């Protein structure tokens, strides 16, 4: 039996741009792509924490160290600069592999600089390293 598992997550990144006239995708700072094990053209889910929209697109490389998180193409109508988003990718794997699987989770600050990469912890709102905005 195969299971669909979370492979990668960039948690609460800040949208820096929305380019309606680009052909599609999400541009992600290359540092964040590497830290989260997301490769160019990989399918990703985008969950907008600010407005609740959810959609799927694919990742393309942004300038390393720039903090860029730019939603491109038609999906640009679903977000606004400064929205907080979660970027996730998934992988299918056999049950035995899934049991031991640990996803790459990347937590960022409000400039999309990596704060840490670690396991997800229940009750994250109490962690000092995570800055929650309402």
Swiss-Prot record:
Transmembrane segments: none annotated. One of its GO terms (molecular function) is aspartate 1-decarboxylase activity. It is found in: Cytoplasm. Keywords: Autocatalytic cleavage, Cytoplasm, Decarboxylase, Lyase, Pantothenate biosynthesis, Pyruvate, Schiff base, Zymogen. The active site is at residues 25, 58. It comes from the Bacteria. One of its GO terms (biological process) is pantothenate biosynthetic process. This is Aspartate 1-decarboxylase. It comes from Geobacter sp. (strain M21). The gene is panD.
């Amino acid at each position: 039996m195969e299971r669909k598992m979370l492979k990668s997550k960039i948690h609460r990144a800040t949208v820096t741009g929305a380019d309606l006239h680009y052909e599609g995708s999400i541009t992600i700072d290359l540092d964040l792509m590497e830290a989260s094990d997301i490769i160019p053209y990989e399918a990703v889910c985008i969950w907008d924490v600010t407005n609740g929209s959810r959609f799927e697109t694919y990742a393309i490389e942004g300038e390393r160290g720039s903090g860029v998180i730019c939603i491109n193409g038609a999906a640009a109508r679903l977000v606004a600069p400064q929205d907080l988003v979660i970027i996730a990718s998934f992988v299918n794997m056999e049950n035995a592999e899934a049991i031991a699987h640990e996803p790459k989770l990347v937590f960022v600050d409000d400039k999309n600089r990596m704060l840490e990469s670690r396991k997800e912890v229940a009750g994250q709102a109490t962690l000092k390293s995570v800055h929650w905005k309402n």
